Amino acid sequence: MTTRLDTRFADLKKEGRAALVTFLMCGDPDLETSLAIMKALPKAGADVIEIGMPFTDPMADGPAIQAAGLRALKAGTTLKKTLDVVRNFRKGEAATPVVLMGYYNPIFIYGVDRFLVDAKEAGVDGLIVVDLPPEEDEELCLPALKAGVNFIRLATPTTDDKRLPAVLANTSGFVYYVSITGITGAAAADDKQVGEAVARIKRHTQLPVCVGFGIRTPEAAARIARHCEGAVVGSALVDALRGTLDAEGKAGPNTVSAVTDLVAALAQGVHGVKPVSA
């Protein structure tokens, strides 16, 4: 079965360019603003949209994304409301893939089977669940694949050649390479190290590889995009959003444009280079 992610990466390969993958927390700073930003992302240049599912114990997230999750929870964001945002986005945008990223606990509480039915119906294309290792594929990964939802796995600098086949076994859509060891937003990605790591992953899979963590500027995104099929930017966008909020954490008049302006600049950087693999 061909998914939106398969189609998008195949189209980009024909165009000879990498994808800009954007991450924002659903419901940050509120559901209405979150949907407005999401609707504006494709036109600004986002090729794939990652949406965070807010969770009370986000162990892999740095301070910026943790704070975004807390703002979203304070605004009343739930997993059901996150799916509603995707559903509303889909009313006007059929082509751009949407990937939900987060932790297993909210999905487990929602109910895996019910979640997959609702996610598919809402227009979700893929899942990144950071705390489910390959050894637990029966929990969510295999049911997701059966439901026609891509399951995207993370590879890191510490994922060696012995471990990589297990990580990649049931991965689909793309592989997410975490360019630094640690939490989101903590350091800058090293493009030489990224190039070597992506080449190593490519020896084990034909899937597109997207690189995230440590990419904050159009220049950095362009450097990384030379080595892979996509550059993922999250913390920088969350920081741009946060900078527009008032003292109570409410959206300001330029909250949407602050995010989309940065996305447009990042897109210009990413789309202006030809990946080595193209």
Swiss-Prot record:
Please write the reaction equations for the catalytic activity of this protein.
(1S,2R)-1-C-(indol-3-yl)glycerol 3-phosphate + L-serine = D-glyceraldehyde 3-phosphate + L-tryptophan + H2O
Q: Where is the active site?
A: E50 (proton acceptor), D61 (proton acceptor)
Q: Which GO terms describe its molecular function?
A: tryptophan synthase activity
Q: Which GO terms describe its cellular component?
A: cytosol
Give the main EC class: lyase
Q: Which InterPro entries has this protein been placed in? A: Aldolase_TIM, RibuloseP-bd_barrel, Trp_synthase_alpha_AS, Trp_synthase_suA
Q: Name one Pfam family in it.
A: Trp_syntA
Establish whether keyword Amino-acid biosynthesis is in the entry: yes
Pathway in which the depicted protein is active: Amino-acid biosynthesis; L-tryptophan biosynthesis; L-tryptophan from chorismate: step 5/5
Q: Which UniProt keywords apply?
A: Amino-acid biosynthesis, Aromatic amino acid biosynthesis, Lyase, Tryptophan biosynthesis
Q: Which PROSITE patterns match?
A: TRP_SYNTHASE_ALPHA
Q: Does the entry feature the keyword Lyase, yes or no?
A: yes
Q: Please state the Enzyme Commission number of this protein.
A: 4.2.1.20
Q: Which NCBIfam families match?
A: trpA
Q: What function does this protein fulfil?
A: The alpha subunit is responsible for the aldol cleavage of indoleglycerol phosphate to indole and glyceraldehyde 3-phosphate.
Q: Which family, according to the similarity comment?
A: Belongs to the TrpA family.
**Oligomeric and partner information:** Tetramer of two alpha and two beta chains.
Q: What is this protein called?
A: Tryptophan synthase alpha chain
Provide the taxonomic classification. Bacteria, Pseudomonadati, Pseudomonadota, Alphaproteobacteria, Hyphomicrobiales
What is this protein's gene name?
trpA
